[in-house]
């Protein structure tokens, strides 16, 4: 018999709560990269944030409580710069709560730059190894277009424009732009076939000059900004929009150092529709411009995108805001509500006759 989502949710919540008394509370070198009480509370807060999806029963106040415990502990604070949590040596971040430690020699496995960058960018960073092909980690132009041009998170997350070698020599293409200037542009024909320079590249984690094929950056799982934004969302969903706006404005402040007036948002603004222009794209043209998802708390949803782009939470956000299986973007067409749940790996199902494949994946 398959365990229900609610039973699994209850089990996870119980396990996390029972672990609290056994987990360390100090933020130090010995506990770095390990679950502390604060890492466990951040995970529990995230489970509570999505409780309505998992069980049908929202747990906004419970999420706020876990967030407040972390914030009031005084163990963490926001880094001065948006990029600081993602530096090559981000073990010094004031903000990161839980990470997976990596090292270019002793703890390998983090080589995202080889997938994100164009092969020619080897000369940009004097890399030991060459990136793979033309680069694959590209931003959807419809999303990139939602950024305020003065938002520092745009250039701190995405690599666009003319590409240069470390000596400032212009780089050239290797495929459809053979011998021509390599200029990353924010456009794609349809999301299926793209030219080698089409699409900004996700480059949130610092790539050091002379980096090897493995990086020294530690992969961030939870940071204090996320805790603040989880609390803000719960306040918004419980009718405290102005309190939520105060938190969001605080988070935005470091992204608008040159334009501090743009950091301020109101509770009313957070409840507006998303500014994302949903619809499929064909031959660079948006073919269906009338979809607007989500309509409720859409601006807050946009804020999550700008702050956490590429940090592996977007799918959950899309499901929680109710449009993962409804909206169209680039070449994506809605194709079934059942896809809010992943299929079980077929190899596992074949091995264990007691397991049932999730509905519609048979």
Which residues does each predicted region cover?
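Intrinsically disordered or highly flexible coil/loop and linker segments, enriched in small
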Residues: 163, 257, 261, 306-310
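An aromatic- and glycine-enriched ligand-binding surface/loop that stacks and positions planar moieties
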Residues: 9, 17-18, 34-186, 326-331
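Extended, hydrophobic/aromatic-rich amphipathic alpha-helical segments that build helical scaffolds
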Residues: 8-24, 31-71, 98, 151-156, ...
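C-terminal substrate/ligand-recognition segments
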Residues: 160-254
């Amino acid at each position: 018999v398959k365990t229900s989502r609610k039973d699994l949710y209850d089990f996870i919540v119980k396990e996390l709560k029972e672990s609290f008394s056994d987990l360390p509370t100090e933020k130090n070198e010995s506990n770095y990269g390990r679950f502390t009480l604060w890492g466990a509370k951040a995970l529990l807060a995230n489970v509570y944030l999505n409780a309505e999806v998992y069980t049908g029963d929202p747990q906004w106040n419970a999420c706020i409580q876990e967030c407040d415990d972390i914030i009031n502990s005084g163990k963490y604070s926001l880094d001065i710069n948006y990029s600081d949590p993602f530096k090559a040596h981000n073990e010094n971040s004031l903000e990161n709560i839980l990470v997976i430690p990596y090292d270019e020699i002793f703890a390998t496995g983090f080589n995202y730059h080889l997938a994100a960058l164009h092969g020619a960018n080897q000369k940009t960073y004097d890399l030991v190894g060459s990136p793979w092909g033309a680069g694959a980690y590209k931003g959807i132009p419809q999303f990139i277009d939602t950024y305020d041009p003065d938002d520092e998170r745009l250039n701190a997350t995405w690599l666009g424009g003319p590409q240069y070698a470390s000596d400032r020599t212009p780089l050239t293409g290797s495929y459809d732009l053979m011998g021509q200037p390599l200029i990353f542009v924010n456009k794609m024909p349809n999301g299926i076939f793209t030219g080698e320079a089409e699409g900004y590249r996700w480059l949130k984690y610092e790539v050091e000059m002379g980096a090897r094929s493995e990086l020294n950056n530690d992969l961030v799982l939870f940071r204090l900004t996320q805790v603040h934004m989880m609390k803000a969302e719960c306040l918004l969903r419980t009718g405290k929009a102005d309190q939520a706006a105060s938190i969001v404005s605080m988070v935005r402040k470091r992204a608008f150092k040159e334009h501090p007036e743009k950091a301020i948002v109101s509770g009313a603004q957070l409840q507006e529709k998303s500014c994302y222009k949903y619809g499929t794209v064909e031959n660079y043209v948006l073919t269906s411009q009338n979809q607007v998802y989500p309509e409720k708390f859409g601006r807050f949803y946009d804020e999550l995108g700008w702050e956490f782009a590429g940090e592996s939470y977007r799918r959950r956000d899309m499901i929680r805001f109710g449009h993962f299986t409804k909206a169209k973007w680039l070449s994506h067409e809605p194709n079934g509500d059942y896809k809010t749940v992943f299929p079980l790996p077929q190899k596992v199902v074949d091995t264990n006759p007691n397991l049932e494949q999730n509905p519609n994946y048979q």
